[in-house]
From Swiss-Prot:
It catalyses: alpha-D-glucosamine 1-phosphate + acetyl-CoA = N-acetyl-alpha-D-glucosamine 1-phosphate + CoA + H(+); N-acetyl-alpha-D-glucosamine 1-phosphate + UTP + H(+) = UDP-N-acetyl-alpha-D-glucosamine + diphosphate. Binds 1 Mg(2+) ion per subunit. Residues 1-229 are annotated as: Pyrophosphorylase. Catalyzes the last two sequential reactions in the de novo biosynthetic pathway for UDP-N-acetylglucosamine (UDP-GlcNAc). The C-terminal domain catalyzes the transfer of acetyl group from acetyl coenzyme A to glucosamine-1-phosphate (GlcN-1-P) to produce N-acetylglucosamine-1-phosphate (GlcNAc-1-P), which is converted into UDP-GlcNAc by the transfer of uridine 5-monophosphate (from uridine 5-triphosphate), a reaction catalyzed by the N-terminal domain. It comes from Escherichia coli (strain 55989 / EAEC). This is Bifunctional protein GlmU. It is found in: Cytoplasm. Pathway: Nucleotide-sugar biosynthesis; UDP-N-acetyl-alpha-D-glucosamine biosynthesis; N-acetyl-alpha-D-glucosamine 1-phosphate from alpha-D-glucosamine 6-phosphate (route II): step 2/2; Nucleotide-sugar biosynthesis; UDP-N-acetyl-alpha-D-glucosamine biosynthesis; UDP-N-acetyl-alpha-D-glucosamine from N-acetyl-alpha-D-glucosamine 1-phosphate: step 1/1; Bacterial outer membrane biogenesis; LPS lipid A biosynthesis. PANTHER family: BIFUNCTIONAL PROTEIN GLMU (PTHR43584:SF3), NUCLEOTIDYL TRANSFERASE (PTHR43584).
């Protein structure tokens, strides 16, 4: 069906006392992203014309964390209930648009469910998201007459008879902007909490003869809110389980789905294998037949076909061509690039460095601000000395160079094609093509040398 224009209100003013944190509750993360950002993303994906974020506690922290230009910041100086929060946003509502109300601490609400709610909203009426619970204690009950929704009664205001009702309000609803403003203006705080409840607009709409249509979410987890860290951790597991299931069904081999975390977006080829305790962050692309060992962290990186990443390796903002091998215990920092068939071994760190085709850095090496050609051997203990305490400088190593162990290359410096650097050399000047560079002092030997002895 053709939908009206729509804006979204996200309630995010709560302090989150039960989180025992200085951080606003809605900024606590689920799958590496603030809870409220999940909700903002859903609103934007729905095509919201405007997103009104109602905030209170920790407003400065929220504004620092959320950089969405589509956000309209609405202050709720006093937290006097959900109806009061909506009243603060009401001046921004257009009469001819629909208003969808969401919550910053309900992070798993799906776009699919919200679209069904939007489609189900009757002309001039309200679309309401409800669920049935075996134990509805603490939640507002949905009242009906002849099957039609007539209102919502909060648990504290409900009679014993009403408390037997299992259908409860999730708090998520959609209505026309002009109607919403009119109903909000009629709210009172005549209840056990002394607050203005948004739920009271259901009864007001019913009294006007407006239709209220209830829609159920696909999964209960979509409407579960977070009030403490235990609830947040449970939703994290729900989310991760869902992501792992999708990946398994798409052909990714997760050795143990319960020990895999996706904190972003994973694009993958065929026959990808991921071992236990792997974390994927940001936007990651894995080519065909990629293998990732246990304990690895991959963030914002592209991994080419047939690459193998051994256990406990960290890869961030890096780009690997096909058939590269990394680790174990390697670290690729932002700007690291490996060309086809390159190898980075254990305890090797790269940053803003390119390792050419078939080149190898096997162990105990730092390569920073470096361009390394094809078929280069970097010996154990090699360091590109790229920083003088104020500025960074580049090291350039040509094709077919052999760098011996325990070499220091003091940038800026260039090593020509086919050159050899002897073990233990400190390179401070450019090395020509096919030359041997050696800076060790001649070895001397003193016969019968006696080591110093500590005085007692």
């Amino acid at each position: 069906m053709l939908n009206n224009a729509m804006s979204v209100v996200i309630l995010a003013a709560g302090k989150g006392t039960r989180m025992y944190s200085d951080l606003p509750k809605v900024l606590h993360t689920l799958a590496g992203k603030a809870m409220v950002q999940h909700v903002i993303d859903a609103a934007n994906e729905l095509g919201a014309a405007h997103v009104h974020l109602v905030y209170g506690h920790g407003g400065d922290l929220l504004k620092q964390a959320l950089k969405d230009d589509n956000l309209n910041w609405v202050l709720q100086a006093e937290q006097l209930g959900t109806g009061h929060a909506m009243q603060q946003a009401a001046p921004f509502f257009a009469d001819d648009e629909d208003i969808l109300m969401l919550y910053g601490d309900v992070p798993l609400i799906s776009v699919e469910t919200l679209q069904r709610l939007r489609d189900a909203k009757p002309q001039g009426g309200i679309g309401l998201l409800t669920v049935k619970l075996d134990d509805p204690t603490g939640y507002g009950r949905i009242t009906r007459e002849n099957g039609k929704v007539t209102g919502i009664v909060e648990h504290k205001d409900a009679t014993d008879e009403l408390r037997q009702i299992q259908e409860i309000n999730t708090g998520i609803l959609i209505a026309n902007g002009a109607d919403m403003k009119r109903w909000l203006a009629k709210l009172t705080n005549n209840n056990a909490q002394g607050e203005y409840y948004i739920t009271d607009i259901i009864a007001l709409a019913y009294q006007e003869g407006r239709e209220i249509v209830a829609v159920h979410p696909q999964r209960l987890s979509e409407v579960e809110g977070v009030n403490n860290r235990l609830q947040l951790s449970r939703l994290e597991r729900v989310y991760q389980s869902e992501q792992a299931e999708k990946l398994l069904l798409a052909g990714v081999m997760l050795r143990d789905p319960a020990r895999f975390d996706l904190r972003g977006t994973l694009t993958h080829g065929r026959d990808v294998e991921i071992d236990t305790n792997v974390i994927i962050e940001g936007n990651v692309t894995l080519g065909h037949r990629v293998k990732i060992g246990t304990g690895c962290v991959i963030k914002n990186s592209v991994i080419g076909d047939d690459c193998e990443i051994s256990p406990y390796t960290v890869v961030e903002d890096a780009n690997l061509a096909a058939a590269c091998t990394i680790g174990p215990f390697a670290r690729l920092r932002p700007g690291a690039e490996l060309l086809e068939g390159a190898h980075v071994g254990n305890f090797v760190e790269m940053k803003k460095a390119r390792l050419g085709k078939g080149s190898k850095a096997g162990h105990l090496t730092y390569l920073g601000d470096a361009e390394i050609g094809d078929n280069v051997n970097i010996g154990a203990g090699t360091i590109t000395c790229n920083y003088d305490g104020a500025n960074k400088f580049k090291t350039i190593i040509g094709d077919d160079v052999f760098v011996g162990s325990d070499t220091q290359l003091v940038a800026p410096v260039t090593v020509g094609k086919g050159a050899t650097i002897a073990a233990g050399t400190t390179v401070t000047r450019n090395v020509g093509e096919n030359a041997l560079a050696i800076s060790r002092v001649p070895q001397t030997q003193k016969e019968g040398w006696r080591r110093p002895v500590k005085k007692k």
